[in-house]
């Protein structure tokens, strides 16, 4: 914990093409080694592929996919008298989005398509339909929280 003051949160500028702040944040998650132009090309390429295949607003599908991936509860380890319990806790809205974006990018990278844009497009479309590896991850996290509901009285 900082001794002085908590650093102020900086606002992310809207992305130039769609004017969406959440998409700009997502580009930052895709970006590696500070290469923002590459990240933009990947994300815009993926959204174009989604538009081609689904014939609908790609931003709408992107937001639908994020909603399908974002977890409502997660487990945190809490030590009580020599035993470690997995305590279910609600996820803050900002962390929900961050986790959803992280999982989306991670599982897109593990897919088999040739380019990252194609992988990302595939994972986005799968997530919007309620399937795919990122949605499975969310379900696993929810299952863990449900299994450890008995320890929810050890709140933080």
Curated annotation (Swiss-Prot):
UniProt GO MF annotations: rRNA binding; structural constituent of ribosome; tRNA binding
Keywords assigned: Ribonucleoprotein, Ribosomal protein, RNA-binding, rRNA-binding, tRNA-binding
Source taxon at top rank: Bacteria
Pfam families in UniProt: Ribosomal_S7
Gene3D superfamilies reported for this sequence: Ribosomal protein S7 domain
Record GO biological process: translation
HAMAP family, per database record: Ribosomal_uS7_B
Function: One of the primary rRNA binding proteins, it binds directly to 16S rRNA where it nucleates assembly of the head domain of the 30S subunit. Is located at the subunit interface close to the decoding center, probably blocks exit of the E-site tRNA.
Protein name from the UniProt record: Small ribosomal subunit protein uS7
The organism of origin for this protein: Pseudomonas syringae pv. syringae (strain B728a)
Recorded name of the encoding gene: rpsG
């Amino acid at each position: 914990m900082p001794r002085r003051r908590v650093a102020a949160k900086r606002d992310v500028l809207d992305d130039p093409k769609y004017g969406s702040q959440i998409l700009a944040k997502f580009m930052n998650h895709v970006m590696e080694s500070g290469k923002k132009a590459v990240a933009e090309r990947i994300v815009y390429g993926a959204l174009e592929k989604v538009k081609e295949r689904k014939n609908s607003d790609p931003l709408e599908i992107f937001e639908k996919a994020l909603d399908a991936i974002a977890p409502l509860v997660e487990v945190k380890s809490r030590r009580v008298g020599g035993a470690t319990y997995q305590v279910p806790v609600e996820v803050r809205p900002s962390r929900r989005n961050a986790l959803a974006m992280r999982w989306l990018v991670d599982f897109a990278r593990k897919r088999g398509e040739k380019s990252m844009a194609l992988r990302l497009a595939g994972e986005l479309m799968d997530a919007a339909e309620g399937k795919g590896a990122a949605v499975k991850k969310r379900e696993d996290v929810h299952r863990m929280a449900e299994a450890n509901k008995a320890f929810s009285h050890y709140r933080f």
